[in-house]
């Protein structure tokens, strides 16, 4: 064994061994308990960042630990390879998205291997290959036949100059990111999958997910947004149709003083024909961003349509306004307004001088003061005719019943969740497998024409999708009739909604999934990824699993038993102000800092001498130039050090502060382990451990070893507090480094201890542990070695620490046998020189003994 720890030599050698031996390749094995450990698959952006490294290190630690428990562990990896960034990069680099993507995959795959992650590479998937997306296309056509897919017009961001649809993130301050033209809202036909058909089950089954974070479950509950209310129909004077609204507060119905409809509502459109102000307002609404978050904060505006609705219970005429806060795609495109008891309605009514009618009493049973704001709390009704005096629940039921009796209302459960729009007007995605015949009939692409392959050899102009620009691509025939293919592509959330299942059978050619393999491995035992995916990806992931279950492919109801959301990685951020007042962000690597005695940064400059402003720690990002390149760190310290720091610096679900001093600390610790193993093995062969022959000190050290095994096992396996597991191993290492190494049993005990330490560290630092295990004469490869088991006998405390007091003051501590009598404890206390001097020449008048804990001698 060489004396110096040289990670650059060890790591490449061990990685080559894993590759050649195919150590982490697995197949279904009914004789073994399975464990499926999955980290969210990366987008091949070009380089790994520290967020990736953290996510994948956590996954690898769990997978290697479970493997050492003797389980059949599947840990796959792949690439979420479609998406918008590839289109931008292709235009910028004058290439096509496909070669750019495949180059990135090759580069990042090498980076993952350099970090020593134990993946089954035989199952690698890239979602942009026809071998993958063909099954997604086929499944979509089956969902269409089941009635779970439909097409309808829906609002998108449209750039009139480029004649193209923009993603929300491509709209900057209401303008096109490319040509700065004012963006419009345009209604175009798009494909939807009926996730709302599964809303109740998606909500209900959250209760089965005991090992998912409550925050994620709450976010999904709110997103699905189940509510119980009443749907009410209003007649409108001079308008052919009725207006339908939904409310969760029918108790306030007698206070409804106006209705509001979306600018795109047929009633508003009709009224605009002879109302120029309304027509202009509708036009303005077309350019409003469609995101819900924007809706909440934007100024509420409206125009009176001139129509009057008839209140179904009072017969009063109430005005119908067109308002920018009502969206056509939400509910019926019309809402009932009760300004006395809803703050948004109140602000709108105050702005436009509309009637505000209170119908709920304040908590003290007085009439509410509505001079400043609405009273939104529930309470007792007044000003409501026959319903006066009823509290919320009774009023809800009485008014709902009355409306139903009159045939103008019905109770209804509503969901905030909307159907999933899967159409994207982009090129780099899987083509949607639908065709349109010349007579307008829409059909799914026949199975013998699947997959609909996306051409990869294209020229990008940065404006139009190549498959939209080429009229020939869309032409096809169905049953001998000419037809046109759909030129939209799937939302990339489609690919990431079922990849976890395809990993169980990536080479399967007979269908989307091989049920036998899928049901052996699924559900996923632990799924690791960022909390930013809480609603979109993790909801679609659950939805797709239920679709596959109902298609007979899987038997479980949910895709993953446990979800672990890792925290973000933060780093110092610095900038200097440029000549034009702009902020120039400087990488923390290039900042020369001065710190105070507490280690806080007080001053910083860069190599060019700019005074830097330190903004504290923030998430590593391109915008703040504070990302640390994992590759540089691996080259400087080795992959094991980077992995150990990542797992030690913070609990897995909390933010991690990147500190190079911490990385250096992790590196020093690995060197200490290496040094101790080197010194130990240099002394030659070791005798067998004879537990019965150990001295009290040796027994105490062995007790520490086995207590550490028990703690680390619990920390990794049950609590998943990986940082405390590492801390416990470090504490044990300090004791081992101080332990005597001369006697035969000293060395035998150290051999047992070091073999345990190396196995416990293996999930975190697998390269160095692979090597040290061999040096310590471990059997076979450490990758196949069992996890150390704590010896219950060794952990039994056969001695205990008793505190000795004289007249109530602590004068010493003594170690005695657990079963020592009071007499023996007194005798032992008298021999303790710190205690003995207080007993000299005095009489012990009383003895208070708490067995195994305290001896108090009262003297006089």
From Swiss-Prot:
Motif annotated as 'HIGH' region, chain positions: 42-52
Cell compartments where the protein resides: Cytoplasm
One Pfam short name: tRNA-synt_1
InterPro entries on file: aa-tRNA-synth_I_CS (IPR001412), aa-tRNA-synth_Ia (IPR002300), Leu-tRNA-ligase (IPR002302), Leu_tRNA-synth_edit (IPR025709), M/V/L/I-tRNA-synth_anticd-bd (IPR013155), Methionyl/Leucyl_tRNA_Synth (IPR015413), Rossmann-like_a/b/a_fold (IPR014729), tRNAsynth_Ia_anticodon-bd (IPR009080)
Keyword S-adenosyl-L-methionine (UniProt): no
Sequence motif 'KMSKS' region, location on chain: 619-623
Record EC number: 6.1.1.4
Gene Ontology biological-process entries: leucyl-tRNA aminoacylation
Residues the entry annotates as binding ATP: 622
SUPFAM superfamilies xref list: Anticodon-binding domain of a subclass of class I aminoacyl-tRNA synthetases (SSF47323), Nucleotidylyl transferase (SSF52374), ValRS/IleRS/LeuRS editing domain (SSF50677)
GO cellular component: cytosol
Reactions catalysed, as given in the entry: tRNA(Leu) + L-leucine + ATP = L-leucyl-tRNA(Leu) + AMP + diphosphate
Coiled coil stretches, renumbered: none
Gene3D superfamilies on file: 2.20.28.290, 3.10.20.590, HUPs, Isoleucyl-tRNA Synthetase, Domain 1, Valyl/Leucyl/Isoleucyl-tRNA synthetase, editing domain
GO molecular-function terms, A-Z: aminoacyl-tRNA deacylase activity; ATP binding; leucine-tRNA ligase activity
Keywords: Aminoacyl-tRNA synthetase, ATP-binding, Cytoplasm, Ligase, Nucleotide-binding, Protein biosynthesis
Protein biosynthesis among keywords: yes
Chief location category: cytoplasm
Family: Belongs to the class-I aminoacyl-tRNA synthetase family.
HAMAP family: Leu_tRNA_synth_B
Record's protein name: Leucine--tRNA ligase
């Amino acid at each position: 064994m060489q004396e110096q720890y040289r990670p650059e030599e060890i790591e490449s050698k061990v990685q080559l061994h894993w590759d050649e031996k195919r150590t982490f390749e697995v197949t279904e094995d009914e004789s073994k308990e399975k464990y499926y450990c999955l980290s969210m698959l990366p987008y091949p952006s070009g380089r790994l960042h520290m967020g990736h490294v953290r996510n994948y290190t956590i996954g690898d630690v769990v997978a290697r630990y479970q493997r050492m428990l003797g389980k059949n562990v599947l840990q796959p990896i792949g690439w979420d390879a479609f998406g918008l960034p590839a289109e931008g990069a292709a235009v910028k680099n004058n290439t096509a998205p496909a070669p750019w993507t495949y180059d990135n995959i090759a580069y990042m795959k090498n980076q993952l291997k350099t970090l020593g992650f134990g993946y089954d590479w035989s199952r690698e998937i890239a979602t942009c290959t026809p071998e993958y997306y063909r099954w997604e296309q086929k499944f979509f056509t089956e969902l269409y036949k089941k009635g779970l897919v439909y097409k309808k017009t829906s609002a998108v961001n449209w750039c009139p100059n480029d004649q193209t649809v923009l993603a929300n993130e491509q709209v900057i301050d209401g303008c096109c990111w490319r040509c700065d033209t004012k963006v419009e809202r345009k209604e175009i036909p798009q494909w939807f999958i009926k996730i709302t058909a599964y809303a109740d089950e998606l909500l209900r089954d959250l209760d089965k997910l005991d090992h998912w974070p409550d925050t994620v479950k709450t976010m999904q509950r709110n997103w699905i947004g189940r509510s119980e209310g009443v749907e009410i129909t209003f007649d409108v004077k001079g308008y052919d149709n009725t207006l339908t609204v939904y409310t969760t507060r029918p108790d306030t119905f007698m206070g409804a003083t106006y209705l509001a409809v979306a600018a795109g509502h047929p009633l508003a459109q009709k009224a605009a024909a002879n109302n120029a102000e309304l027509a202009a307002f509708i036009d303005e609404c077309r350019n409003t961003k469609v995101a819900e978050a924007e809706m909440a904060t934007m100024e509420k505006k409206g125009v009176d349509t001139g129509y009057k609705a008839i209140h179904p219970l009072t017969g009063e005429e109430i005005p119908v306004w067109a308002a920018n806060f009502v969206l056509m795609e939400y509910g019926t495109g019309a809402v009932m307004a009760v300004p006395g008891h809803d703050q948004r309605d109140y602000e709108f009514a105050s702005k436009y001088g509309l009637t505000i009618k209170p119908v709920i009493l304040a908590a003290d049973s007085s009439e509410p003061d509505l001079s400043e704001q609405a009273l939104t709390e529930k309470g007792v009704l007044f000003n409501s005719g026959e319903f006066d005096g009823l509290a919320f629940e009774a009023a809800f039921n009485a008014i709902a019943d009355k409306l139903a009796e009159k045939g103008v209302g019905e109770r209804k459960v509503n969901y905030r969740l909307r159907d999933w729009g899967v159409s994207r007007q982009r090129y780099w995605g899987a083509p949607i497998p639908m065709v349109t015949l010349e007579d307008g009939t829409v059909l799914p692409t026949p199975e013998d024409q699947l997959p609909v392959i996306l051409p990869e050899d294209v020229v990008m102009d940065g404006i139009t999708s190549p498959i939209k620009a080429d009229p020939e691509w869309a032409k096809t025939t169905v049953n001998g009739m000419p037809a046109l293919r759909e030129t939209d592509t799937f939302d990339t959330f489609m690919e990431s909604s079922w990849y976890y299942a395809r990993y169980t059978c990536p080479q399967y050619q007979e269908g989307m999934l091989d049920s036998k393999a899928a049901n052996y491995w699924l559900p996923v035992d632990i799924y690791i990824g960022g909390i930013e995916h809480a609603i979109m990806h993790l909801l679609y992931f659950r939805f797709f699993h239920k679709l596959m279950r109902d298609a007979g492919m899987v038997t479980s109801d949910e895709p993953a038993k446990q979800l672990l959301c890792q925290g973000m990685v933060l780093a110092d951020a610095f900038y200097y102000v440029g000549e034009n007042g702009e902020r120039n962000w400087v990488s923390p690597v290039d900042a020369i800092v001065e710190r105070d005695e507490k280690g806080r940064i007080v001053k910083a400059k860069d190599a060019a001498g700019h005074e830097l402003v330190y903004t504290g720690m923030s998430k590593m990002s391109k915008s703040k130039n504070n990302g640390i390149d994992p590759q540089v760190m691996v080259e400087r310290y080795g992959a094991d050090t980077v992995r150990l720091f990542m797992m030690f610096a913070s609990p897995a679900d909390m933010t991690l502060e990147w500190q190079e001093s911490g990385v250096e600390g992790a590196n020093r610790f690995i060197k200490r382990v290496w040094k101790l193993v080197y010194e130990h093995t240099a002394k030659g062969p070791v005798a067998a451990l004879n537990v019965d022959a150990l001295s009290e000190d040796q027994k105490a050290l062995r007790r520490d070893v086995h207590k550490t095994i028990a703690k680390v096992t619990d920390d990794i396996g049950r609590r998943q507090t990986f940082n405390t597991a590492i801390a416990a191993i470090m504490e044990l290492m300090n004791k081992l480094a101080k332990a005597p190494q001369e006697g035969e049993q000293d060395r035998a005990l150290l051999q047992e201890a070091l073999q345990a330490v190396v196995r416990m560290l293996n999930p975190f630092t697998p390269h160095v542990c692979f090597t040290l295990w061999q040096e310590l004469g471990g059997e076979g490869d450490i990758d196949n070695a069992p996890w150390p088991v704590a010896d219950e006998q060794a952990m039994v405390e056969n001695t205990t620490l008793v505190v000795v007091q004289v007249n109530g003051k602590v004068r010493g501590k003594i170690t005695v046998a657990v079963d020592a009598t009071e007499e023996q404890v007194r005798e032992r206390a008298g021999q303790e020189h710190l205690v003995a001097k207080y007993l000299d020449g005095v009489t012990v008048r009383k003895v208070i003994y708490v067995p195994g804990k305290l001896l108090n001698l009262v003297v006089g």
